[in-house]
Amino acid sequence: MADLLEEYRRQRRLKLEGNIYHKTQVELAYNSNHIEGSRLTEEQTRQIFETRTVDGHARLADIQDATNHFRLFDAMLDTAEEPLSPELLLSFHEVLKQGTEQAASDPIFAPGVFKALPNEVGGLVTTLPEEVPGQLASLIERYEGGSRAFEDIVDFHYRFERIHPFQDGNGRIGRMVLFKECLRNGVLPFIVPDDKKRFYYRGLANYEDEPGWLL
């Protein structure tokens, strides 16, 4: 996927509408944020990307989330060839959550730091805050030492979400890492569509017994 990565970077420099970079930015931001509860339409997401304005009613928080997601995609393109590390994931989180109402109103949601309070995903118990650094480092070490085939990338995503290292933003970071690792390892990258989120969450919940829901 080296050619695709370079094409994304080339098209970003050109700043033209309608190319694959433009299309991926809009579709990835729309779907990943919508899975997490954003009310923006895909057209509104497109308007924000193209003009930094939006027609119709839109929550300020949703606009900020979309804008930050565009920046996160660019940060991912800049680091796509780098190995995973806790520091890289923390930097992604800082980009995603920078300037949000949530981060401004409660230090628990500060950007670029691991969670301070327990959280959950789909009713599943996640890693305790004090255990996050060690478990995440171990997960990354195992992953980086493997073949990093498609199945390994999906397995990493599942185990990252089970750790749920951040107070908020884990799903969006996890899905961006999925995209990054596909680009890095010669796998065609893909977007998890919002209209399939029921199957996506089922896949996360049942992965140990039925990995096929994610694969």
What are these regions (language model features)?
Residues 1-215:
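FIC/Doc superfamily catalytic core
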